Amino acid sequence: MKAYWYDNKPGDQREPHDSGRPVSEDYLASLGVIYRHFPELSDVDALAKERGYKNRDEITVSPATMGEAYEDKVKMFFAEHLHEDEEIRYIRDGEGYFDVRGKEDEWVRIRLVKDDLIILPAGIYHRFTTDNKNYIKAMRLFQEEPKWTPLNRAPELDENQHRKSYLEGLTATSIAAN
């Protein structure tokens, strides 16, 4: 895993867009983002049990598996959105980027590779893309039946209870740190 501030320069979303300014795991944790490196699937199983995750599936994002739909899917994943459930992804193969909004609404890019696991809290704005190799295989973990329901960023989402709870948690973390 490598995290850094996104450079916001125009260009292909699948390029690194590395500003040269690193972001620490502690900062990610302050956003509610949890990172782990799990070389063994048994570690993922233990985390799933601990967090009450009963279901999982695997998705391979590549032109070979998605055909003509690939470019549209990657664009859809890259649209800024949130979920009302936390999102857990375990990278089985390949590489990709999760971008999450920092405390000042700036993008933090998180590069994930094989055996990396990330947990994004409910209510955090984020987006995803493959890297320029156009291939990633990820396990998706779910507490209930597998579902992936993105809520694309819009002003009315400021009133979403999951978004409000997330922002309240950020405020509480900031106050506790001072």
Swiss-Prot record:
Report any Pfam family annotated for this entry.
ARD
Chain sites annotated for binding Fe(2+)? H81, H83, E87, H126
> What's its EC?
1.13.11.54, 1.13.11.53
Q: Where is the composition biased (Basic and acidic residues)?
A: 9-22
Q: Where is this region: Disordered?
A: 1-22
How the cofactor is bound: the record states: Binds either 1 Fe or Ni cation per monomer. Iron-binding promotes an acireductone dioxygenase reaction producing 2-keto-4-methylthiobutyrate, while nickel-binding promotes an acireductone dioxygenase reaction producing 3-(methylsulfanyl)propanoate.
What broad class describes the main subcellular location of this protein? Answer: cytoplasm
So what does this thing catalyse? 1,2-dihydroxy-5-(methylsulfanyl)pent-1-en-3-one + O2 = 4-methylsulfanyl-2-oxobutanoate + formate + 2 H(+); 1,2-dihydroxy-5-(methylsulfanyl)pent-1-en-3-one + O2 = 3-(methylsulfanyl)propanoate + CO + formate + 2 H(+)
**Function of the molecule:** Catalyzes 2 different reactions between oxygen and the acireductone 1,2-dihydroxy-3-keto-5-methylthiopentene (DHK-MTPene) depending upon the metal bound in the active site. Fe-containing acireductone dioxygenase (Fe-ARD) produces formate and 2-keto-4-methylthiobutyrate (KMTB), the alpha-ketoacid precursor of methionine in the methionine recycle pathway. Ni-containing acireductone dioxygenase (Ni-ARD) produces methylthiopropionate, carbon monoxide and formate, and does not lie on the methionine recycle pathway.
The family this protein is said to belong to: Belongs to the acireductone dioxygenase (ARD) family.
Protein name per UniProt? Acireductone dioxygenase
Please name the source species.
Emericella nidulans (strain FGSC A4 / ATCC 38163 / CBS 112.46 / NRRL 194 / M139)
